[in-house]
A protein has these predicted regions:
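Acidic, proline/glycine-rich low-complexity IDRs
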Residues: 142-175
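Short acidic-glycine loop/turn motifs at beta-strand connectors
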Residues: 105-108
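Extended hydrophobic/aromatic-rich secondary-structure runs
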Residues: 57, 127, 135-136, 156-160
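Residue-level detector of alpha-helical secondary structure
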Residues: 31, 131-134, 157, 169
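A surface-exposed partner-binding patch
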Residues: 1-102, 163-175
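Generic alpha-helical structural element
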Residues: 19, 32, 119-122, 157-160
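Compact, glycine/acidic-enriched structural inserts
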Residues: 113-146
Length: 175
């Protein structure tokens, strides 16, 4: 990839999404252990096909040191004290960062962000689905690499509400 050409592999590890084949049985295990009936199919396809278990965008980490299973996703949710409240709302945690935690609505596929200061009624929609979220996060990371944060926010202003923009602005440090 041109953008990361010449960088030390230790730096690029975890910021380049690479193909991985994780068995479908991991989705069934995830659903069973988290007590969820349905998991958005687009999200399922992405997490079975790529190395989300060792990947992040900017300050947001999906998984860490787990490229062969979905244990990172199971543990992230089960270790969260308020997971039962999330499960009742069909939500799971898919990434953590500062200051937001990223949630997936298991049925609709919508992506939300919330902070420890928010109630679950105040969560903010940041993307209509996982693919849109990933594309926006990747674009944000590229904008930071190219010092084009303001241009990134200008493009996001055409797509997102003011409450969503707060997340995207904080992601690229534009206030």
């Amino acid at each position: 990839m041109e953008e990361t050409e010449g960088l030390d592999a230790e730096i690029t590890d975890g910021i380049i999404l690479s193909k991985k084949e994780i068995p479908q049985s991991e989705i069934e295990k995830l659903k069973s252990e988290l007590g969820i009936e349905y998991l958005d199919s687009a999200f399922s396809e992405y997490i079975l096909s790529y190395n989300w278990g060792n990947f992040g965008f900017l300050s947001y980490q999906f998984g860490y040191d787990d490229e062969t299973s979905l244990s990172w996703l199971i543990n992230r949710n089960l270790d969260y004290d308020e997971y039962p409240a999330l499960r009742k709302k069909n939500l799971i945690i898919i990434a953590n960062g500062d200051p937001y935690t990223i949630l997936l609505d298991c049925k609709s596929g919508e992506i939300y962000a919330f902070t420890s200061d928010m109630t679950y009624e105040e969560i903010v929609t940041v993307a209509s689905d996982f693919e849109e979220f990933v594309r926006a996060m990747g674009t944000a990371q590229y904008a930071v690499w190219k010092n084009a944060e303001k241009e990134f926010i200008e493009s996001m202003e055409r797509e997102y509400s003011e409450s969503s923009l707060k997340f995207w602005k904080e992601l690229v440090s534009v206030y």
